[in-house]
Swiss-Prot record:
Annotated binding of [4Fe-4S] cluster, by residue: C333, C337, C549
Protein's name in the database: Glyceraldehyde-3-phosphate:ferredoxin oxidoreductase
Any Pfam family the entry gives: AFOR_C
Assembly description: Monomer.
Induction: Transcription is significantly stimulated within 10 minutes after addition of cellobiose to a pyruvate-grown culture.
Transmembrane stretches, start-end: none
Species of provenance: Pyrococcus furiosus (strain ATCC 43587 / DSM 3638 / JCM 8422 / Vc1)
Single Gene Ontology BP annotation: regulation of glycolytic process
Amino acid sequence: MKFSVLKLDVGKREVEAQEIEREDIFGVVDYGIMRHNELRTYEVDPYDPRNIVIFGIGPFAGSVLPGSHRLVFFFRSPLYGGLFPSTMGGAGYQFKNVGVDFVEIHGKAEKPTVIILKNDGEKLSVDFYEIELEKLLDVWKEYKGEEGVYALTQYLLDNLASVFEGMEFRIAVVGPAALNTNMGAIFSQALRNGKRAVGSEDWAARGGPGSVLLRAHNVVAIAFGGKKRKREFPGEDISDVKVAKRVVEGIHKKAQRDVINESTVKYRYNPKLNTGGTFGGNYPAEGDLVPVLNWQMPYIPKEERIKIHELIMKYYWEPFNKESIQPKNWTTCGEPCPVVCKKHRKGHHVEYEPYEANGPLSGSIYLYASDISVHAVDAMGFDAIEFGGTAAWVLELVHKGLLKPAEVGISDVPEFTKDDLITKPVEASEKNAKLVAELAHSIAFGKTEVARIIGMGKRKASKILDEKFKDRLSYGESFKDYGVYTPLGDDGEINPTMYWAIGNFIPLPIQGRYWTFYQFGVFLEPEELAQKIVSSALWEFWYDNVGWCRFHRGWMKKVLKALFMEAYGVSIDMEEHAKKQIRKLIDYLKKAGYEPVFWDSMRVIDLVAKGSEEFGNENWAKKFKEDKIGTAKEYLKRVLDAYSQLIGTEWTL
């Protein structure tokens, strides 16, 4: 297929526009894999300017089909070690007016720089706007009563809005977390009439894209937009409602509106549960399997987990329903979409993963307390999942006396036991959430030596802390044993998504996203788990490759092959192509020195072992009781062996 590419060298201030045509490239991830291999980025550190950041839209942006306008970022992750896609909802809707498919960022700017991409309808212009580092730090600390990514967004709006007069545009920014940690995200808020739209916030966060953007390239923001333009599809014009509808209805044999509504009910509104969105749907579904207190579920008796879940429903879920669902405070990510999945209240966008990681996982089950922690974590520009997992780990370490509050930059010891949550849910939550907010500022700004070490990630930090504080550890104990992450190679790591799901802990070429089987509460035979992981990963690859929102996967999966044929006249063996590209991701990882390893955290091993018992697999539960470590190794090896066979490569212990 044909794509247009803009190559920017931010160090030399050089711009090159290109058209590429390749039979095996159908989207951003395909293109990114090709370019990173051509540039051999596996040879260099993730913060080397050679580690290009590629971002762009998929081949169906510009269509009328909802969900097709995610902006995809592709880079080598400083956390996990390999190539990584991270996607941002809705931002492709404004980016399509720039008039290119993909942008490559090369080189390193001398000073913190904003890239400005504008298409006035006649030509595309690229400008660079510099900010002194001291000024940037000042803005992050406070601008017009806000901080971090919110402050920088407003500052750039005030200074750059006139550049885009009469045009639709959007700004993507990083926060201080990108400067001082491996877990910096890229934030963007939809704009309406030049003002930030409440609740319409989105992130490209997983894997640390913000950190790469700033630390490899010294880019702090990208402003993009232009005059409205129509995308030309070489085949059928799917920017025409009637044409797109015909394709969807031809596959599903029912009205497009019904197809979309039925398959997105969880994300819009579920009348059976009287709630909607990921936050509304997940808490009732997970029950006592909700991750709490740094994943201590294996050590908390079921009846007490049930009590904690009842308190979560009362103090977390019910206020959300009253303040967001009942008054219908729902919006979109910035593209026209009937799902309106962005639920918000009191100026806060409320999504399950950030509010879970920086809420119950970090010792807060009171919604108004978590508003403080989540907003601070977001403002600092963290990947909220990665940071929440890190904060939960730090709070437990401080509670156990392995780290001291002053060392990590917080004011007190947390109340971090099941009894604290059960007997004083509000007070314990308020204290813990306040400490998470303090920790977010401490780590983002690198306020202490230990805070700067923690910013590297749990696994990388543990290697240093094990040596630094060895006198605090008992024989054979490691800081790693309290951390929950999926390991890769010697130092690769990523925080799993917020489900007690065995598939979340398997070291796959892409983890921490949904390229796995993330169903909680089931313990499958290893070969069956591998099969379900592959079935999921092959299609998650495609959603990222074409920049389509996965909330639409229920109807879009069946339509995608037909869309390629109708709009572009190309026939693709979807699953075979995905397998081929996953093999390329694996080859890249091996060249970079990353292969699967056994779990090096006792907490992760306990989650898997206890999972076998809790989720009702008696055979494996018995084996784990007899030999926990040996059984864990056997299980993981069998999963990876079966995965390797299904993908057609070698990816095993």
